[in-house]
Amino acid sequence: MQFSPTNGDFTFVSSTDAEELSGTIDAPDITLNMGPESNRDTYATTFLRQRGYGWLLEVEEEESEDTKPLLEELDIDLKDIYYKIRCVLMPMPSLGFNRQVVRDNPDFWGPLAVVLLFSMISIYGQFRVVSWIITIWIFGSLTIFLLARVLGGEVSYGQVLGVIGYSLLPLIVIAPLLLVIGGFEVVSTLIKLFGVFWAAYSAASLLVGDEFKTKKPLLIYPIFLLYIYFLSLYTGV
């Protein structure tokens, strides 16, 4: 049946004239072939879980937040070591450095690096000098520590070990000068004395506190002798 509107804009056609559409879509059967190994893994997993051994299948994931840099793991603070080096090389109070941090906040890696550096420039083909310098550093610091405790000083062995190690820096500074002017005996001797006084003053000003009072020379003198011995290991005297 067909209707024609008066305005002629639309034409309506009955649905009986349209063809009916029908059909089916064949979907192939899809099977996942995981292989025999997958079946064995599934069976093993089920077997372990049924027997109460499921915890063997758990994988622990390491948290990245717990990982720390290597320097932090070894307790190495490069900024702190650099500041202590400046305190030792410039011991004058007028420069404004908080020099007591070398004594009150001792560390091991900084002094060890200084001692090893002094040992390396002292080798001159004699590798046994390295072990001698490290031995003198350890036992010389122990002697200064015991003497300081006997005199009533409130210092620890770690503090003495750090101060004595860092105070080797003046001897490292004068080492290149001795290589250049080694032929001038008078000038070379003056530089050696200056280096020893520099190192001894830097160490003594950190270790010898007000608690020693009139006993200061009793501790300053062995410190001075210790750095003379260090210098003798370098020069081969």
Swiss-Prot record:
One of its GO terms (biological process) is vesicle fusion with Golgi apparatus. Residues 128-131, 182-188 are lumenal. The keyword Kinase does not apply. Residues 1-106, 153-160, 210-216 are cytoplasmic. Keywords: Golgi apparatus, Membrane, Transmembrane, Transmembrane helix. It is found in: Golgi apparatus, cis-Golgi network membrane. The keyword Transmembrane helix applies. Pfam families: Yip1. One of its GO terms (cellular component) is membrane. It is a multi-pass membrane protein. The chain crosses the membrane at residues 107-127, 132-152, 161-181, 189-209, 217-237. It comes from the Eukaryota. Belongs to the YIP1 family. Involved in the maintenance of the Golgi structure. This is Protein YIPF4. The gene is yipf4.
